[in-house]
Design a protein with these regions (language model features):
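Serine-hydrolase catalytic machinery in alpha/beta-hydrolase-like enzymes
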Residues: 7-91
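Short beta-strand immediately N-terminal to the catalytic nucleophile in serine-hydrolase-like folds
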Residues: 97-102, 126
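The conserved beta1-alpha1 loop
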Residues: 17-21, 127, 154
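Active-site loop/turn elements of alpha/beta-hydrolase fold enzymes
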Residues: 48-52, 128, 193
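The feature captures the conserved acid-bearing segment of alpha/beta-hydrolase catalytic domains
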Residues: 130-210
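Gly/Ala-rich beta-loop-alpha elbow adjacent to hydrolase catalytic centers
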Residues: 101-106, 110
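A conserved amphipathic alpha-helix that caps or lines the catalytic cleft of carbohydrate-
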Residues: 34-35, 114, 177
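Conserved hydrolase catalytic core segment
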Residues: 112-122
Length: 215
C-alpha cells in the first residue's frame, strides 16, 4: 500500500481516496479533474493505493466469485486506522471531518468501512460493487448507520452486462440507498455511461458534494 497527499488544505474535510494502482499520470489527472469541478480547495485529499484490489478490498470470501476475492478488507481498514489516520493528526483538527471514498470495489469497501468504525463522518461510493454477494444482506443485518453523510453514484448502463452478479448492481444499489436514507444524509446520483465512463469526473463530483458540507 502506498499513500499520496494530492491536495492539501488547512481547513475543510479530509478525504481518504482508496484506489487501485495508478497508471502514468492518473493521480494528477484525477486531482486536476477535482480542482476543475470544485474550484477553491477547502479540503485535503489523500490517495491510498491498494496493489491487490480483489484481495484487500473484498469484505469476505464467497463461493459465487473467484478465489482472488480473498476477503481481507479488514487488513486494509486496520492499516488505514493504525497507520494512515494517526499521521493526519485528526485530534488536533477536531472540526475537520474525515471521509472515505472509493470507486468500484473500493466504493463497496468505503461503505463497508462505515459499519466497522465510527471514525468517518461519511463516505462516497462511486460505481460501487454493490452486487458483491451478501452485501445487501450484510447491510440489513447491521445496526443502522445514523447521522452520516453518504454519496452514492452509479452509471446508468452499469447493469447492462452478461455477468449475472454485476447485472444486479442497479437494483442492489437502490435497495441500499433506500435503507440508508432513513437515518442519514444520502444522495444517489445516476451518471451517463457504464462502469468505466468518466471515472475521474465521477470522483470529482463526489468530492464536490463532500466539500460543500464544510464540516
Amino acid at each position: 500500500m502506498q499513500v499520496h497527499t494530492l491536495i492539501s488544505s488547512g481547513n475543510g474535510p479530509i478525504i481518504l481516496w482508496v484506489m487501485y494502482p495508478h497508471r502514468g499520470d492518473e493521480l494528477e489527472h484525477t486531482a486536476d479533474s477535482i480542482r476543475e469541478l470544485v474550484g477553491e480547495e477547502q479540503f485535503t485529499l489523500v490517495a491510498i493505493q491498494i496493489d491487490d484490489w480483489n484481495r484487500y478490498l473484498s469484505p469476505w470470501r464467497s463461493d459465487e466469485v473467484d478465489g482472488s476475492f480473498a476477503g481481507e478488507a479488514g487488513r486494509t481498514l486496520d492499516y488505514i486506522e493504525q497507520q494512515v489516520v494517526p499521521q493526519l493528526d485528526i485530534q488536533s483538527q477536531a472540526n475537520r471531518p474525515l471521509y472515505i471514498m472509493g470507486y468500484s470495489l473500493a466504493g463497496l469497501f468505503a461503505l463497508w468501512a462505515m459499519y466497522q468504525t465510527d471514525i468517518f463522518a461519511g463516505c462516497a461510493t462511486c460505481s460501487g460493487s454493490m452486487w458483491y454477494p451478501g452485501f445487501v444482506e450484510y447491510v440489513n443485518s447491521q445496526p443502522t448507520l445514523a447521522n452520516k453523510r453518504i454519496y452514492i453514484s452509479l452509471g446508468g448502463k452499469e447493469s447492462r452486462t452478461s455477468d449475472r452478479l454485476m447485472a444486479t448492481v442497479a437494483d442492489r444499489t437502490k435497495e441500499i440507498c433506500d435503507l440508508l436514507k432513513k437515518d442519514n444524509d444520502v444522495i444517489y446520483e445516476i451518471n451517463p455511461g457504464g462502469h468505466f465512463a468518466d471515472s475521474g469526473k465521477r470522483l470529482a463530483k463526489a468530492v464536490k458534494w463532500i466539500e460543500k458540507a464544510k464540516g
